[in-house]
Design a protein with these regions (language model features):
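Long helical/loop segments within the catalytic core of UDP-sugar-dependent glycosyltransferases
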Residues: 4, 12-14, 20, 24, ...
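Catalytic donor/gating beta->alpha subdomain of glycosyltransferases that bind UDP-sugars
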Residues: 48-82, 116-120, 125-172
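Nucleotide-activated sugar donor-binding and catalytic core shared by glycosyltransferases
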Residues: 33
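Short loop->beta transition adjacent to catalytic acidic/histidine clusters or analogous donor-positioning motifs
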Residues: 1
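Walker A (P-loop) phosphate-binding loop of P-loop NTPases
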Residues: 8
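Residues within well-formed alpha-helices
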Residues: 13, 17, 29, 43, ...
Length: 172
């Protein structure tokens, strides 16, 4: 289902608005520029069979072509490393946060976020973990995105993530 709103208010506002209109027990979020594998939704739903699971994080993969630049290549290496850490964390108990490219939550655990939230995926998933639920990590559900077009774009992305990290510390 698509819920149209003519004015842009940001992703967090869209999530807050959309969640008021959803009646399914599980809600899956992706980024607009993300492609997911065919079995992703099925694999995510299976992870929710464990009642301790409140959020399921999919794996982020970067599509790197031979013609791509160093920014894309470096981003791909970073996400392979990050994915390994998330999988190890989840094996011990719970992943720490979810990436916005592909994650899902139990609808009843969603709490409206501040409209200016920079890292909605991280804040939402950690708030669910703070309620005592596990963030499962599902490597069989993955999202594929293109890497940063150039180093300037990658720098802007990193600055936004750093600012969002600081904002998250204050809010959590």
């Amino acid at each position: 289902t698509v819920f149209f709103q003519p004015e842009r208010q940001g992703k967090t506002a869209a999530m807050n608005r959309g969640m008021k209109l959803v009646d399914t027990p599980i809600v899956v979020f992706t980024d607009a520029n993300t492609m997911v594998n065919r079995q992703a939704i099925r694999e995510i739903v299976l992870a929710f069979e464990d009642p301790r699971v409140g959020c399921v994080a999919g794996e982020k993969r970067i599509a790197v072509q031979a013609k791509d630049n160093a920014a894309s290549g470096g981003e791909g290496i970073y996400w392979r490393y990050e994915s390994t850490l998330k999988a190890l964390d989840a094996r011990l108990y719970s992943a720490v946060g979810a990436a916005g490219e592909l994650f899902a939550v139990r609808r009843e655990l969603f709490a409206e976020m501040e409209r200016d939230t920079l890292l909605d995926d991280f804040v939402l998933s950690l708030r669910i973990a703070m309620q005592g639920y596990i963030i499962a990590y599902c490597t069989e559900a993955y999202a594929i995105e293109s890497g940063s077009a150039d180093m300037r774009e990658e720098e802007k992305r990193k600055v936004r993530i750093a600012a969002g990290g600081l904002q998250s510390i204050w809010r959590l």
